[in-house]
Regions:
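Short, conserved, surface-exposed binding loops centered on an aromatic residue
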Residues: 37, 80-81, 97-101, 127-130, ...
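Walker B catalytic acidic pair
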Residues: 110-112
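GG-anchored amphipathic helix commonly corresponding to the ABC/SMC/Rad50 NBD signature/C-loop
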Residues: 71-72, 78-107, 119
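Short, hydrophobic/aromatic alpha-helical segments in well-folded domains
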Residues: 32-33, 95, 123-124
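Phosphate-coordinating catalytic segments in nucleotide- and nucleic-acid-processing enzymes
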Residues: 1-89, 186-193, 209, 213-217
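Conserved D-loop-proximal element of ABC-family nucleotide-binding domains
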Residues: 114-118
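C-terminal lobe/lid and adjacent interdomain/linker elements of RecA-like ASCE P-loop ATPase modules
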Residues: 122-217
Length: 217
């Protein structure tokens, strides 16, 4: 969903019926998003397709609309037909725009990296770190963030529920944080265990066992 003023949000996967005020606000939001979206995904814009008047549950006039993906030289398609990564970017872009320019905003996004191309994720983080006025807090499984953010800005999850997040210790300015993280998984050396060890041989046996059960019915 696209965050906007207050709790106003628009579903990306289905059409929605809006009153006149929210329809006009949606047009403003889409214009803001397109200003940035075109630079992230060249040739792409969002369009608001208006299916005409449709009564709201209250009986008042409403307009049924749907967000469409418009690319140069192609017919517009519903946003829901785009890739997971593009849908993710569109869903958070307006909120990122607001946080970028407003120092009073602290934006929290779970799994910011979900479906987003790794290089693009790095570019977004670099721009936000160097130029944003607001604050961005996010979770990510993608290690690209370790290469783009200052070490003071990164906390790592641990296997200890009593001490779930830590800063990595013994990090020097010349260290590659991504390499240190992987080394800490295999060799340890941090105050907490940051990954519960798995046995690759045991995993392989489990796959073979599951495969046999499928073949044997």
């Amino acid at each position: 969903q696209i965050g906007a003023k207050g709790d106003f949000a628009i579903p990306l996967m289905t059409p929605v019926t809006l009153d006149k005020e929210r329809k006009e606000l949606l047009n403003v939001i889409v214009a803001q998003i397109n200003t940035v979206l075109y630079t992230i995904i060249p040739g792409m814009n969002i369009e608001v397709r208006d299916y005409g008047k449709q009564a709201l549950d209250s009986g008042e006039d409403g307009w049924k609309v749907e967000l469409m993906s418009a690319r140069e030289g192609r017919y517009p398609i519903p946003i829901r037909m785009e890739s997971e990564g593009i849908i993710k970017i569109i869903s958070v872009l307006n909120a990122l725009i607001q946080a970028f320019g407003n120092p009073s905003i602290c934006l929290a996004i779970d799994e910011l990296d979900a479906g987003i191309f790794e290089y693009m994720l790095g570019e977004l983080l670099d721009i936000f770190q160097n130029s944003a006025k607001g604050q961005l807090i996010f979770t990510s499984h993608n290690l690209r963030a370790l290469e783009m953010l200052d070490k003071e800005s990164i906390m790592f999850s641990t296997a200890n529920p009593e001490n779930r997040y830590i800063h990595m210790k013994n990090v020097k300015g010349s260290n590659n944080l991504r390499s240190m993280y992987i080394r800490s998984i295999t060799l340890g050396g941090q105050d907490e265990l940051i990954y519960e060890e798995t046995d690759s041989l045991e995993i392989a046996r489990a796959f073979r066992k599951a495969g046999r059960s499928v073949r044997n019915g």
